[in-house]
């Protein structure tokens, strides 16, 4: 995962990454390295990080922790949801790309002081609405266009947050929420109010935690 930690003046930020690389076979391992690139919205490279060489000898995973100070990045807010592009590439030692993941992310810091919510050091009133992943014609198979239309309506009515009642949404929903400047109260997939006895059974504890 990726996290951002702004300094006391909410100017510069530490970009922090914790990356798990999993190996599923007993094949002989070779040396790899992880390359991380951060791009702005003009496709200009902001920074690049490279891990030390590593290998995974058997089935299992390797955890890598990387960080870099980013000077005065553009901040994400609900009114100006600026997003960077982060690409992580798993490379062999000759530079060949074995695998890659790309995502968009924003630099922001959220805090709760007393009973107040702050974004990047600024007091923010949270205006939230419940949202179900359902449509009168499409059912639960909501398309990207439908989700965008929902978010456009929410923004027109000055909402800056949405609660995914009562289950986690698809990843595209979360990606678009970042794009539109919406905080997401993402509910875990433990909906059981129709049969509440499930939540009282200890054997379901670990399943609940995993979700």
Residue ranges of predicted features:
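Active-site-adjacent "subsite" loops/lids of carbohydrate-active enzymes
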Residues: 127, 189-210
């Amino acid at each position: 995962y990726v996290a951002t930690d702004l300094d006391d003046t909410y100017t510069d930020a530490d970009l922090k990454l914790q990356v798990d690389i999993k190996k599923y076979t007993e094949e002989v391992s070779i040396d790899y390295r992880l390359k991380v690139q951060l791009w702005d919205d003009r496709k200009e490279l902001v920074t690049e990080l490279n891990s030390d060489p590593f290998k995974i000898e058997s089935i299992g995973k390797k955890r890598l922790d990387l960080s870099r100070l980013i000077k005065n990045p553009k901040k994400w807010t609900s009114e100006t949801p600026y997003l960077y592009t982060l690409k992580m590439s798993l490379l062999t030692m000759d530079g060949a790309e074995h695998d890659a993941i790309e995502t968009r992310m924003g630099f922001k810091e959220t805090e709760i002081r007393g009973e107040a919510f702050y974004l990047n050091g600024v007091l923010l009133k949270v205006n939230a609405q419940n949202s179900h992943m359902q449509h009168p014609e499409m059912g639960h198979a909501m398309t990207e266009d439908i989700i965008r239309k929902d978010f456009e309506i929410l923004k027109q009515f000055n909402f800056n947050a949405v609660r995914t009642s009562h289950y986690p949404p698809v990843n595209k929903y979360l990606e678009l929420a970042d794009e539109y400047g919406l905080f997401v109260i993402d509910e875990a997939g433990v909906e059981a109010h129709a049969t509440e006895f499930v939540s009282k059974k200890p054997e379901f504890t670990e399943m609940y935690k995993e979700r």
